[in-house]
Amino acid sequence: MASNDSWAKTPAQPKRVGLFGLVCLVISAMLGGGVYNLPQSVAQGASAVAVLFAWIVTGLGMLCLANVFRILSIEKPELKNGIYSYAEKGFGRFMGFLVAYGYWVCNCFAMVVYAILLPSTLDLFFPGVFGDGTNWASIALSSGITWLMFVLACRGAQSTAIINAIGTIGKVVPIVLFILLMGSCFSGDFFAQHALGSQGAATLERAQFFDQVGSAMMITLFLFIGIEGAVVVSGEAVNAKAVSRATMIGFTVTLVLYVLVSIVPYGSFTQDEIGAMANPSMAALLASHFGLWGALLVNVGIVISVLSAWLVWTVMLGQMPFYAAKDRVFPQVFCKENRVGAPVPSLLATTLVVQGLIVLAHFVQGNAWQVMVNITAVMAMPCYLVCSFYLFKLALRGPWSSCVRRSTGLAFGLAATLFSCYLIYEANIELLVVACTIFVIGFPIYLWARRKEQVFTKSEACLAVIIVIAAIVGICSMVGLI
């Protein structure tokens, strides 16, 4: 009789994801449901000119970050799970654990954003059933979809890449149609007249303008989480060159779509009008010009967008504990695969965490969607910082090939490091406390994985103590004990 322990077998010839599949993965990971409310989100606090300025700053910063992942995929093609493996290679196993765990938890929260957005969108079709996306009907629907994504992800990265390619095309088409339809109503004179918002050039002060830019950047920065998508599954890619090209192509396409979606409405609506639009604002804008069918088009796009991104993140998150376990910073149980190379225990753990967070969202006070978005953003930034600094360190004094100039790697590494530091500096202090607390909750996972070996070096022990103290002091301060 054949053995049933197929999880322990590593497939000899796993199927690989090609350039098109990787590009779709990057686009789908970044182009989530947030794009459908982008016009209203940025217009609530920024004029057209401020939004353009925010996109310039964000675009340059994220271009540097995209090049960090592009160059690292070329210089270190043997590191098959980018975000984690770069941290572990550059700064030791404990830092590797922090990035692996932080990135994993961060995007578990991001998946809960999808779990809230989807039923709240469907409430337009079934009024009163799903509400704001956190009632028990919503939880039941989102839970069912979460486990369906688990089943699909267990079929392997290549199988899900095909589904994701179809989903990516399905989500991009409504966005392109929105840009074309709103572009047909665009008035250059109207745009110029209202470019600085309701205050106008006469009364707008410089400090107010940069406050508007900062407000818009809080939205634009969150939208780019997922830029590392091709790197995270680089172990499943046909080659390192495909990973590099997919990262840059996906970034460019997504940036162009984001800029056009956020700017084109200013050609026929004022800032105040766009900021007052109902969620999702893309649907409300089209409905204002073209009637109900415009809103229907966008809502269908949201459903496709969320389902596609949900699947992508399930696959990506399944890779993180798997590769971390191979380097003994996660428990060895996560090393197991099924016969098609899918890391089933890792996928199962991800699904269970997401399931728990979906239920938790029901009890969150206030806007649960915004809470999940904020936690996702603050947990992602340290991960990007570590990868950026690793490239800077590597280009400064590490081994280097002739494929990319060392000075190029040094410049992009330094620029992305400074950009990531700025993002962390701008984060809300309460969110940083939450991040430290989440890291501390994960420490037992690392202790379990390293129980038979040296757990910490001296510097790692100091870092762990600092994180614990920061979490304790922050919590005590928030509850008024100090």
Language model: regions and residue ranges:
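Loop-to-transmembrane helix boundary motifs in multi-pass membrane proteins
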Residues: 14, 18-19, 139-143, 239-240, ...
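C-terminal membrane-solvent junction of multi-pass transporters and transport-like membrane proteins
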Residues: 337-338, 384-469
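Membrane-interface "cap" regions at the ends of multi-pass membrane proteins
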Residues: 1-40, 44-45, 49-52, 62-71, ...
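Select transmembrane alpha-helical segments in multipass membrane proteins
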Residues: 15-26, 92-105, 141-145, 205-218, ...
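Helix-loop-helix junctions that connect adjacent transmembrane segments
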Residues: 7-15, 52, 129-137, 169-299
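TM-loop-TM module centered on a large, flexible mid-protein loop between adjacent transmembrane helices
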Residues: 84-88, 92, 124-128, 203, ...
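Hydrophobic transmembrane alpha-helices that form the core helical bundles
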Residues: 43-44, 54, 63-146, 150-154, ...
